[in-house]
Amino acid sequence: RERFNISTAPLSIDVGDKHFIDDENLDREGLLDSMRNSSDAPKTASPGPGPFLDLYRKYDNIFVVTLSKELSATYQNAMLAKKMILEEAEDKLIKVFNSFSATVGETMIAYKLGELIEAGFNRDEIIEKTEKYIEEMQTLFVLDSLDNLIKAGRMGKLKGKIASFFNIKPVLGATPEGTITLVDKARGSKRAIRKLIEKIGERGENLEEKVLGIAHCNALEKAEYIKGKAAEKYSFREIIIVETAGISTVYANEGGIVLAF
């Protein structure tokens, strides 16, 4: 964040009677503990236009990266705030990017933007190259727990119980439209991780030019294993590992892994 001067308009999460703000002060262990002990699905809320307006007033040349607009109202609120601020100060330069992704996908887009800025590209070039990057970016993830999908009604209880009983792990991905889809499935975490690593080769192109981002939710050992195997098998320019933040933790749940490249 310091290197690229990144600020955040945080989302919020409610689990039962507990309220969490997804910023740098988030109690991630507290969030995980609340999710484990609640029969209700976590409820997430996007920031309204207000937090974006506060940030827009601080800077004149701004790039914004949001969660997929198919998953959250964050993009729409960032755009509404842009319209409002331009009525106050029409000379501000604000570009809002829909990530068509989530979690480490957003991180990788911000990383790309930072690299382009440091490399000295002009604003139009940065926008063009970033839009191309988003269009080509792949997001894949493996869930260790189906609890939140079941609680949220995204997976029927019976189907979820059968999957859990047979230890079936879904390999999921982002569609070009920014929704979540089933890519593959495997019995057991180890097989699911192997499939996840295989999918990199099936979906990725020009990997020597790209950075692989790996986000994990309390699963550093698993993330390190994937990093090692991906380094052996593919020619990524760089591989980075990050911990999931709040919303990412809700998506991934404990043991979850998310890749973006």
Q: Locations of the language-model features?
A:
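Mixed-charge interfacial surface used for oligomerization/domain docking
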Residues: 1-14, 71-74, 78-83, 95, ...
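N-terminal/domain-start segments enriched in small and hydrophobic, helix-friendly residues
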Residues: 31-32, 36-39, 49, 60, ...
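Acidic/glycine-enriched edge-of-secondary-structure segments
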Residues: 29-47, 176-191
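N-terminal glycine-rich anion-binding loop in soluble enzyme alpha/beta folds
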Residues: 1-45
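Short catalytic-loop micro-motif centered on adjacent basic/acidic residues
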Residues: 43, 64, 96, 213-214
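Structured helix-beta-strand junction loops
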Residues: 3, 37-38, 58-59, 65, ...
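Active-site cofactor/cluster-binding pocket
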Residues: 47-88
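Rossmann-fold dehydrogenase core element
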Residues: 89-93
